[in-house]
């Protein structure tokens, strides 16, 4: 039996989120304007606070990586199989669940979001949160892309 590297699962009803969909969309629009100014094709969020701020989902990692991928048109959370469809129910966006059957399925889930014909040239990451190991793996997968620290800009966007 072939086990999947990642999959989607939408079961149950969407939960009431802390903020309205309009609020999350306003936050995303502000972030996308930064992406446009800084020529970023994609952002990989990894911190609990930024994933929650932009998607509504608050994770508990249990030693597994979590992420939220933001492009010009998409926002997708990447979560571990242990959470099943909870991240989809507790966010205003799509979700991809990665499995633990093989190493680095988290990264495979990230690359599944990208159009194969449009590899991102510039990717924003959170240098104040991402581990050195994950940073190296992202650099290997996106070897033709430049990684840019956007952690300070993200923090400013969260300020009222």
Language-model features: locations:
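Short internal beta-strands
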Residues: 66-80, 124-126
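Short amphipathic alpha-helical segments
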Residues: 56-58, 89-90, 135-138
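Compact, glycine/acidic-enriched structural inserts
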Residues: 78-108
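Conserved residues at the C-terminal ends of beta-strands
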Residues: 46, 99, 126
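Flexible, acidic/His-enriched mid-domain "rim/lid" segments that flank
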Residues: 1-13, 23-28, 104-160
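Glycine-rich nucleotide phosphate-binding loop and flanking beta-alpha elements
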Residues: 50-52, 84, 131
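Terminal domain-start leader segments
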Residues: 1-72
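Short, solvent-exposed amphipathic alpha-helical segments in soluble enzyme
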Residues: 59-61, 93-94, 139-142
